[in-house]
């Protein structure tokens, strides 16, 4: 499946703003996952962050503004959770997508755009593994990334809301409740074992 990651050639011809919009589109499509897994942040917190980043597309984000966005991301309680048994771990993983988008806005170029694309695809793959068709979300996310890039090259700009209406986001909304319920049960069992050991 690694061979199916996007390459620099896929992004060729996009302006800095186009690269940023492609990355922000990934951030928006995975928004339902953050809302489903986050146990502390409100459901709109992530969306507001991505929308504010999107407002910067088309211009370079300076060092000071970039640091302000990074501090804002670091303030999310889920950030820093590195225990894959916990729900917050998956919310933290989603946050990696807008972080890469921020780096693109700050002038990170194609390499950061590729990192953003791969982060989104890895998450889609992780969720796909919990479904009967292990490639379903991966394939849908990959096709959506390519569709958005093609649209940008043709002068069509995605919006946060158009990304939420994508097949990927709609499918996530359908399958996430069951995935989260399973993960929550594993989390509760894990935490119970820890309490028992104490």
Segments and roles (model prediction):
Residues 2-154, 159:
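Structured binding/interaction patches within domain cores
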Residues 148-198:
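Charge-dense, extended regions
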